């Protein structure tokens, strides 16, 4: 992940903090099964659009696979990162998107963690992933810290 390497180099030079979040659309399989894959694609676009509009300049988002996205929040402590992702959740749930003249409500669960010095990105992503699945297990449409 090039954006991670860039942010890690900045951290090594300047210090500071970096929060890493994983987002996963809730009930994505059911959405695809009930409304079709085009609805799933539209949900992914709605989430990506909300994230792009809501994040600060300098924050980064990328599709991570399936219905997951990774978010890098430079100069953001993990508690602030949790607040950023919670704001994203509110922004997404405040807007519905239309699919074949039907309003579709989409939510996502998130996990966020603090990058710890010289660790590999995979280690931070694993913590964020564990926090993401804690959010799913404990009710969905929420953010947990890992």
Predicted features and spans:
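Catalytic core regions of nucleotide second-messenger enzymes
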Residues: 63, 81, 92-108
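Cell-envelope/extracellular polymer assembly enzymes that use nucleotide-activated donors
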Residues: 19, 109
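Short, hydrophobic secondary-structure boundary micro-motifs
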Residues: 20, 100-101, 143-146
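Short catalytic/binding micro-motifs of nucleotide second-messenger systems
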Residues: 10, 53-58, 90-102, 132-134
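Catalytic-core segments of nucleotide cyclases and related cyclic-nucleotide turnover enzymes
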Residues: 78, 82, 86, 114-145
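Conserved metal-coordinating catalytic motifs of nucleotidyl cyclase and c-di-GMP turnover enzymes
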Residues: 21-24, 66, 128
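Cytosolic catalytic cores of cyclic-nucleotide second-messenger enzymes
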Residues: 1-17, 27-75, 79, 83, ...
């Amino acid at each position: 992940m090039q954006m991670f390497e860039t942010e890690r180099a900045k951290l090594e030079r300047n210090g500071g903090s970096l929060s890493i979040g994983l987002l996963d659309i809730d009930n994505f399989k059911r959405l695809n099964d009930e409304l079709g894959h085009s609805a799933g694609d539209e949900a992914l676009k709605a989430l990506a659009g909300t994230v792009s509009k809501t994040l600060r300049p300098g924050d980064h988002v990328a599709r991570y696979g399936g219905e997951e996205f990774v978010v890098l929040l430079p100069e953001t402590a993990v508690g602030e990162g949790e607040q950023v992702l919670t704001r994203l959740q509110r922004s997404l749930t405040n807007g519905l998107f239309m699919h074949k003249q039907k309003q579709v409500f989409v939510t996502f669960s998130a996990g966020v963690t603090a990058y710890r010095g010289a660790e590999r990105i995979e280690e931070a992503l694993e913590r964020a992933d564990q926090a993401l699945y804690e959010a799913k297990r404990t009710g969905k449409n929420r953010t947990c810290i890992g």
